[in-house]
Structures are given as C-alpha cells and as structure tokens.
C-alpha cells in the first residue's frame, strides 16, 4: 500500500454532473441512428444516460450488443413513476419511465437507456429476446409499477402475492400501514391465498407427462434447510433428474425501495444493512457513496480507509459462513462450528469499533459515526495472526476432501457467455475467467491505493471453483486489512461539508441561525440537490448498486437497489437442467445468497 495515500480532493470529483457526450458510445449511436434520435441526460451517475423512443428500444439494444466492444450484460432494468417529479428540465415528457442499464466488459463502461411512457399507454416491448435475464426484471417492473412488457413469456407477479391488488411503487400507492384498512385474514381469504400458491405446470409451459411417462412435481422449500431462506423451487422430475424447475421468490419482500421514499437520506442507512443481512457495512457503502455524489461531498482519506477496513471485515465474515455452510450442505458438519468461532472474533472487533454486531448502521453521509476507539489495532492484529492458520486447516480438512470434490466439481457448470447473459457477478463470473471485480475495475473509497489480487478461474464456473475462489478472496481481504492496520491515515472522521449528516454539534452554539440549521438537518434531514446518482460496489455476493433520484427534497424520489443474489437465482433453471436433485443442493450452497438480498 502506498504510504502517502492519494489526496482524493486533488482528483476530478466523482460527483460532477456530466452528460458524457465524450463517451465513444454516444458517437457510435449518433452515427447509426442520427444526431437527433435521442436525448442525453446530464446526471451524477457516472454513466451516459440516453432517452430513446420506445420504437427504437430493441434496435438500439441489438446495436449495442453487436458493437466491436459490445455491451454484453443487462445489469439492471426497472421503472420509475415520474408523475410527481418536479425537476425534469430538458427531459422527454413522461408519466412513467423504464431504464435499461447495460455493461461492456471490454470497454469497462456502462450505458443507461431510458424510455418515456404515458399513463394511458404503459406498454414497451420485452427485452428478453436480447437478454434472457430481463425476464425477472420485467416481471418485477410490471408487478410494482403496472408497466406491460409486450411479448414477455410469462408476465406475472414475482414479489407480491398473485392475489395482490395494485402496484406498490406507484406514487399514488400508500407507503404506510396506517393508510390501509386493518388487516383481516378470513377463512375464505386464507383458502384463496393457498389456492394461489398451487403450482400449475401448464402456466409455466411445462407438460405433466408424455405418452410413456408422467413427470413428478416436487416443492423444494419454502421451508427446506437447503433453500437457505424462505425460497421455493418447483422441480419437474423424471426420476431424480431435473427436467425443469421454477424458482419462486418474494416471501421475504419488505418493500425496501418504497421505504426509501419516506425516510430521510440519513435515516435510511439502517435499512441498507438489512438488504443483505450478512454484509453489514458492505451494504452501507454503495448507498452513502451515491448520496455523497448527490451532495458533492469528498470524504477525508481516513474515512476511506476506515470504510474499506469495515467492509473487508464483513466480507471475511460472510465468506466464512458461506464456505462452512457449503461444506455442511455437502455433508460435513464440523467446519460450521469452527467458522463461528472465527466469526465471533470478527464480531468482537466490529462491536468494539461500531458498537453493534450484524447491523452497525455506522457509515454516515460524509464520513462515519465516530472515530476508531483506542485498542482497535490490537484486536485487528490478533485476528490477522489467527485467521490464516484456520483458513489453511479448512482447506486441508474439508475442501481437499475427495468426496466434496466429487460432489461439486463439474456440477452446475457454465461458461462466460452464460454468466454474462444471466447478469452473474462476483465469484460466479470470475470463475469463468472474466477478471471483473469492481474494487479493481472501478475503484471506490480508495481501493486503488491497496495492493491485492483478484482470484480468477480457468474458464468454467462450477460449484467447486466458486467456493475455492471465495477462499482465495478471503486471503486477499486479509492482505487489505493488514495494509489498513499499517497505513491508517490521520485526520478527521467526517468531511467538513454543509450536508454532512449529522452536522457537528458544536456549530449549534454560534447563533440562532446555526441552531435552526442543525435542528432542521437532524429532524427533517438534509436536502439533496435534484439529480440522479449511481454507485456499484463489489459486495460479498457480487455487485450491489444503488441508483438514487433526488427531486430536491429531504427524501429520495426513487431508490433502486440492484442486488447480485436476484440475478443468480434467476439463472438456476439454466444451470441445473439435466442434473440430479442432490446436485441442486450442492449448487444452491455454491451460489452464496440470502433471501433478503433477493426479495428486498
């Protein structure tokens, strides 16, 4: 690690509002479709944002996918209710909009396409013909906004129950329980809900049998221990062979994006911890960075290193649970108990620094909650001396076991093409040989100042390769923590900026104006300038991102959370068809997901 850490204030701020007209893809689009074919929106997302006509969508998408350095991954797709948005200067008229976020690995660049829709014509052609992973994203957008995707293979609810009325992310849909009538579960309603959960194969394009045999349909979950949460997979079986399967999600849906519209920018931080409840501060990182882009805040170097340190501690904590439970899914119990001993040491350190364990809610807009306590370095030193030997013992005792290898090598295998088509990120993508880790490819919070490697597989992502990459990632996180320990900068733990929240208490004592300013910022929350911002991070399970829209208020107009687990579960049928039920159990253990991350 560089001892004289980079002065980030001397660099071009990441929060500048830009239209990205200098991005090569804008020129390529204009050359193909004409200079007046679309509207370019200036934002603080860090990517070109281009409004196109609905009729151009598939043609533009196909063009981007076939460029010499193509946009090969549909990273995200969702909608927005634009009807109450007041700051829309220069944008096409729209009651609703749909956005498509595409990534080019070769260019290491993104582009966001937007389509404007009128309330009386909420139709847009399905994107599944170009990107198969658009399936779930379009279902969710229809479920929560009521936007119809013409030609979609099975446009039905995915987050809400099939019997639900209305579309919750619309602005005219209530955001608080007190706005609803008291909930009553009558016998008739209970029977209706149970009937709605009955799986009908024909609705999913499945056959109940052939001339010579009948298929068996088996519910795995939503209460099966190997489902790793409230998650159901309906299996179509020929003997023990999986002919097809349908993942059924939404049981853990809490309306996290809707909550973002009624919490202040500051008070939403605790909710971010619970999106992926094992990641802790890792989940706070993309949110606070996106808010800081809106606010125009550049944090001190000490804040960057503290944030990296906490993120890597939680990465190790999550990986330890993942590795040990994977081994347990295959059939060995002992490593789980050893791993919880190691995780307790991390929790002791996290608790000493933040005051909390799993959900610290410790990052702040402009910094962290408080400075590092005395003795933090001793606790970290003890952990760094302890963990490498333990990791070696796991690898020797369990991960090199011939039975475990036989159960996991070659199981649920896919290549780079399939990974990109399904929006796979994290170890699942890197196992295919694609070297893409956001900490290296698009450094944030000072990761460019750290010396560490990105483990990459040999071309095929199977269960065993994914697990072994996580083991090596754990070692690299230990390297990063060592550098944090040896090179922690001096300086403040918060930025000196008017929108840093909470503001310094001592400024309230100057005169009545500063007291009122402090009172409003703490009670109502800071007012963020009207704009859009975006931040992705390499989270514990893949790429996690927040796409925030501010309308110049104390609360977010739209909070879009893209989680890696959502994309990874959608890929299950494509990766497991033709395998056995026992292989599915191993595959689920190798994905590394929690349902709170999927359902939000």
From Swiss-Prot:
Q: What compartments host this protein? A: Cell inner membrane
- E.C. designation(s): 7.1.1.-
Return the InterPro entries for the record: NADH_DH_suC, NADH_DH_suCD, NADH_Q_OxRdtase_suD, NADH_quin_OxRdtase_su_C/D-like, NADH_UbQ_OxRdtase_30kDa_su, NADH_UbQ_OxRdtase_49kDa_CS, NADH_UbQ_OxRdtase_CS, NDH1_su_D/H
Q: Read off the PROSITE patterns from this record.
A: COMPLEX1_30K, COMPLEX1_49K
> What is the protein's membrane topology class?
Peripheral membrane protein
Name the chemical reaction catalysed here. Answer: a quinone + NADH + 5 H(+)(in) = a quinol + NAD(+) + 4 H(+)(out)
Alphabetized GO MF terms: NAD binding; NADH dehydrogenase (ubiquinone) activity; NADH:ubiquinone reductase (non-electrogenic) activity; quinone binding
User: What start-end ranges are recorded for coiled-coil regions in this protein?
Assistant: none
UniProt subunit comment: NDH-1 is composed of 13 different subunits. Subunits NuoB, CD, E, F, and G constitute the peripheral sector of the complex.
Q: Name the chain's protein.
A: NADH-quinone oxidoreductase subunit C/D
Organism encoding this protein: Escherichia coli O1:K1 / APEC
Q: Which gene encodes it?
A: nuoC
């Amino acid at each position: 690690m560089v001892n004289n850490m980079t002065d980030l204030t001397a660099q071009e701020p990441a929060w500048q509002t830009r239209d990205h007209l200098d991005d090569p893809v804008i020129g390529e689009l204009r050359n193909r479709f004409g200079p007046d074919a679309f509207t370019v929106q200036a934002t603080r997302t860090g990517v070109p944002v281009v409004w196109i006509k609905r009729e151009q969508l598939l043609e533009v998408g196909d063009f981007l996918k076939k460029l010499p350095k193509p946009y090969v991954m549909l990273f995200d797709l969702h909608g927005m209710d634009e009807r109450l948005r007041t700051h829309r200067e220069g944008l096409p008229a729209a009651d609703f909009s749909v956005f498509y976020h595409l990534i080019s690995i070769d260019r290491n660049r993104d582009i966001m396409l937007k389509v404007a829709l009128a309330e009386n014509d909420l139709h847009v052609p399905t994107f599944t013909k170009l990107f198969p992973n658009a399936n779930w994203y379009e279902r969710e957008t229809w479920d929560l906004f009521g936007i119809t995707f013409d030609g979609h293979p099975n446009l039905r609810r995915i987050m809400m129950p099939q019997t639900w009325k209305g579309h919750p992310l619309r602005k005219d849909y209530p955001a608080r329980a007190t706005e609803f009538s008291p909930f009553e579960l009558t016998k008739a309603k209970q029977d209706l809900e149970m009937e709605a959960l009955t799986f009908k194969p024909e609705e999913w394009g499945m056959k109940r049998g052939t001339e010579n045999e009948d298929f068996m349909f088996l519910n795995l979950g939503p209460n099966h221990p190997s489902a790793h949460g409230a998650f159901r997979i309906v299996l179509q079986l020929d003997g023990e062979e999986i002919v097809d399967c349908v993942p059924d999600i939404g049981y853990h849906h809490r309306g996290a994006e809707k909550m973002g519209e009624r919490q202040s920018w500051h008070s939403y931080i605790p909710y971010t911890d619970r999106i992926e409840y094992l990641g802790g501060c890792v989940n706070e990182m993309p949110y606070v960075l996106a808010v800081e882009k809106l606010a125009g805040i550049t944090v001190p170097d000490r804040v960057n290193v503290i944030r990296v340190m906490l993120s890597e501690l939680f990465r190790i904590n999550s990986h330890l649970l993942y590795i040990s439970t994977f081994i347990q899914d295959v059939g060995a119990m002992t490593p789980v108990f050893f791993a919880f001993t190691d995780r307790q040491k991390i929790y002791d350190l996290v608790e000493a620094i933040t005051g909390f364990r799993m959900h610290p809610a410790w990052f702040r807009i402009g910094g962290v909650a408080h400075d590092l306590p005395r003795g933090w370095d001793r606790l970290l030193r003890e952990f760094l001396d302890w963990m490498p030997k333990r990791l070696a013992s796991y690898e020797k005792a369990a991960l090199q076991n011939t039975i475990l290898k036989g159960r996991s090598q070659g199981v649920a295998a896919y290549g780079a093409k399939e990974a990109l088509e399904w929006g796979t990120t994290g170890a699942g993508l890197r196992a295919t040989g694609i070297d893409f880790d956001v900490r290296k490819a698009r450094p944030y919070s000072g990761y460019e100042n750290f010396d560490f490697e990105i483990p990459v597989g040999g071309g095929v992502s199977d269960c065993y390769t994914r697990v072994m990459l996580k083991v090596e990632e754990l070692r690299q996180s230990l390297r990063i923590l060592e550098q944090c320990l040896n090179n922690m900068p001096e300086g403040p733990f918060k930025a000196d900026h008017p929108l840093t929240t909470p503001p310094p208490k001592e400024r309230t004592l100057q005169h009545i104006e500063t007291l009122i300013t402090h009172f409003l910022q703490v009670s109502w929350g800071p007012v963020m300038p009207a704009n859009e911002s975006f931040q992705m991070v390499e989270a514990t399970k893949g790429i996690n991102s927040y796409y925030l829209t501010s309308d110049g208020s104390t609360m977010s107009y739209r909070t879009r959370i893209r989680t890696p687990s959502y994309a990874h579960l959608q890929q299950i049928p494509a990766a497991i068809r033709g395998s056995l039920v026992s292989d599915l159990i191993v595959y689920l253990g190798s994905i590394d997901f929690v349902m709170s991350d999927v359902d939000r």
